[in-house]
């Protein structure tokens, strides 16, 4: 992938418009989880140190487009960001007509979704945004799969369009894992439904040496292999698709599972062989034998792509499979990349954040990239790199 990088450009005295992903949870006017804000700090600090006039933009939540609503205001984000940077970060409400900002200073533009035409990638809106800056920086990987005015359109019209460090690092890591991976390449795909991950599974089946499936997805593969799944979550209509994938790539089917009679935090867990699953059982995790087999694969791997837990790890009695796998990834010498909301929660829960080579900040964008889809924001940056 060839794109301009913000870190290679002279930013001194330039009007730099940076699209970050600052879509964080807010409760009672306070940010409750600031991981995305912290992830954007190196980009912002680099631009400030370089003496740029820094304008930040982001969306927050899903307001009615074109209408101001206080509950979706970025004011709490501006306050929190100011605390982290140790400086005032003014929030600019009406910013499309122009923004006053001095060299080495930063402002945050109010929620991009308050502008009519943002989601439709409106050309007139994109041109207004582009007129604000000398350099446009796309740094929000989490929204790179959406062609919107602040993530895509503005980049077509800005004098210069480049990738910020967060986006560039993300693309470098994904490229390393998918374009020319060290082998063996092992992918773990968990989650509740095959239907939502079918394209990912099909795309990976052509690239990986081992494909580990977990969660409800594994139940469909178990059923496809002729095993009983009781009243577990699985998709009967996708059994043929699962069988087709299993013919193309090695999928270690669980040999033992952890079951319960009900889906609840207090449900009693029972470990049993796959052939012993009863009609009223729900499979909620892989068993210890299966976890050992998967852990051994992690040891052999040179590249690991992880998306989705292998069990209902939110309930501790059904979290052992995901825990053992997470620790095996942490101990592995492989280049490992983890992405997707539930995956990041598991990485966090088992304390392996600094043991995973790269943690992807994008959920949908991560999956679409793994599927081999073209991300509109990335395509735009590649096109602008030729200017």
Swiss-Prot record:
GO biological process terms held by the UniProt record: gluconeogenesis; glycolytic process
Subcellular location: Cytoplasm
Alphabetized GO MF terms: ADP binding; ATP binding; phosphoglycerate kinase activity
A cellular component term, taken from the record's GO annotations: cytosol
Reaction it catalyzes: (2R)-3-phosphoglycerate + ATP = (2R)-3-phospho-glyceroyl phosphate + ADP
Record-listed substrate binding positions: 21-23, 36, 59-62, 113, 146
Keywords (A to Z) from UniProt: ATP-binding, Cytoplasm, Glycolysis, Kinase, Nucleotide-binding, Transferase
Residues where ATP binds: 197, 314, 340-343
EC number: 2.7.2.3
Pathway annotation from the record: Carbohydrate degradation; glycolysis; pyruvate from D-glyceraldehyde 3-phosphate: step 2/5
Sequence similarity: Belongs to the phosphoglycerate kinase family.
Record's subunit section: Monomer.
Record-given protein name: Phosphoglycerate kinase
Lineage: Bacteria, Pseudomonadati, Pseudomonadota, Gammaproteobacteria, Oceanospirillales
């Amino acid at each position: 992938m060839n794109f301009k990088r913000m870190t290679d450009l002279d930013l001194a005295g330039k009007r730099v418009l940076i699209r970050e992903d600052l879509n964080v949870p807010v409760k009672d006017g306070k940010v409750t989880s600031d991981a995305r804000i912290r992830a954007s700090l190196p980009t912002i600090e680099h631009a400030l140190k370089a003496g740029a006039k820094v304008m930040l933009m982001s969306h927050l939540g899903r307001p009615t487009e074109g209408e101001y609503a206080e509950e979706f205001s970025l004011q709490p984000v501006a306050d929190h960001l100011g605390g982290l940077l140790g400086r005032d970060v003014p929030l600019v409400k009406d910013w499309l007509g122009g923004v006053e900002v001095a060299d080495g200073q930063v402002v945050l533009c109010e929620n991009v979704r308050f502008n009519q035409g943002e989601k439709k990638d409106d050309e007139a809106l994109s041109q207004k945004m582009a007129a604000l800056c000398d350099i446009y920086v796309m740094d929000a990987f989490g929204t790179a799969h959406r062609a919107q005015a602040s993530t895509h359109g503005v980049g077509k019209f800005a004098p210069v369009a480049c990738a910020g460090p967060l986006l560039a690092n993300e693309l470098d890591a994904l490229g390393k894992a998918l374009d020319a991976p060290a082998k063996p390449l092992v992918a773990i795909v968990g989650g509740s439904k095959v239907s939502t991950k079918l394209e990912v599974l099909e795309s990976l089946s052509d690239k990986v040496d081992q494909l580990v499936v977990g969660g409800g997805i594994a139940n469909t593969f178990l059923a496809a292999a002729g095993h009983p799944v009781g009243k577990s979550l699985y998709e009967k209509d996708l059994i043929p698709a699962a069988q087709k994938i299993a013919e193309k790539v090695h999928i270690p089917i669980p040999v033992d599972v952890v079951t319960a009679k009900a889906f609840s935090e207090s449900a009693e867990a029972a470990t049993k062989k796959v052939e012993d699953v009863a009609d009223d059982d729900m499979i909620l995790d892989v068993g210890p034998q299966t976890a050992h087999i998967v852990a051994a694969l992690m040891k052999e791997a040179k590249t690991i792509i992880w998306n989705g837990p292998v069990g209902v790890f939110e309930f501790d009695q059904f979290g052992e499979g995901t825990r053992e796998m997470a620790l095996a990834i942490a101990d592995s010498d492989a280049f490992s990349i983890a992405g997707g909301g539930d995956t990041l929660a598991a990485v966090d829960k088992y304390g392996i954040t600094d043991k995973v080579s790269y943690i992807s900040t994008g959920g949908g964008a991560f999956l679409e990239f793994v599927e081999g889809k073209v991300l509109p924001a990335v395509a735009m940056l590649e096109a602008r790199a030729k200017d």
